[in-house]
Amino acid sequence: MNRLAVEIPGLSLKNPIMPASGCFGFGQEYSKYYDLNELGAIMAKAVTPEPRLGNPTPRVAETASGMLNAIGLQNPGLEHVLAHELPFLEQFETPIIANVAGATEDDYVQVCARIGESKAVKAIELNISCPNVKHGGIAFGTDPDVAHRLTKAVKNVATVPVYVKLSPNVADIVSIAQAIEAAGADGLTMINTLLGMRIDLKTRKPIIANGTGGLSGPAIKPVAIRMIHQVREVSNIPIIGMGGVQTVDDVLEFLIAGADAVAVGTMNFTDPFICPKLISELPKRMDELGISSLQELKKERANQ
């Protein structure tokens, strides 16, 4: 038996580690450095119905223990991704999780109805942190009713399991998770970035042209651990955890908190080899901690 294997809806993972969406493109650049078949899965870059140029620059800023970004979901659009990006990934056995974003409910439905046309795509990650342009720009993921309705609409058309990515910029993460689960979501991914800002002392203005950006990296890990633990306390829904993963101990901390698998984001920019490194280090660290397999760790967590 593979002691690192994880089985969650649509995804048979040889190990629990994958690159997070937005930090890995569509895999072509990283494939020059290592075999993508080593990965548990790949969370591809966000896709919208039409191409998007993203936000004006500067749109990235370094922070203590992390970074801010306001890329603005820059991507070549659904048709290009189906024709040129996903076919490249079909050569690998690694399951692909397609990240889907939009400005309206119709945008999400349009992409989710078709993204499964690629045989590489085994699941969808629904990015509900996007602003809803028909409701004053409030993010889809901050209102339980809106999140429920969007999840249900997508589940009606999706041909693969749907995982919904939770925003941490909410007062009650549990109520959002419960609303999404009630709508039929197959799983959750959590957490997305926290809203942040940096000021340039010389210009007296925000460094990010957009004003604010998403804070990621080690700074947000305690928030991610807390939120995953809160959701796991009330639900058995599959969770892919993320937010500040740097080390193999971080991976295990996420799994013990309640995640079934773990995604690595910002660290890919610091060390392109971070995912295969963590995968190779995980068995030894499990031995040191007396963890026979991830399946046993999950049972232990359930019995606590």
Swiss-Prot record:
Its cofactor is FMN. It catalyses: (S)-dihydroorotate + NAD(+) = orotate + NADH + H(+). It is found in: Cytoplasm. FMN binds at S21, K45, A46, N99, N127, K165, I191, G217, G243, G244, G265, T266. Binds 1 FMN per subunit. GO terms for biological process: 'de novo' pyrimidine nucleobase biosynthetic process; 'de novo' UMP biosynthetic process. GO terms for cellular component: cytoplasm. Belongs to the dihydroorotate dehydrogenase family. Type 1 subfamily. Heterotetramer of 2 PyrK and 2 PyrD type B subunits. This is Dihydroorotate dehydrogenase B (NAD(+)), catalytic subunit. It comes from Listeria monocytogenes serotype 4b (strain F2365). The gene is pyrD.
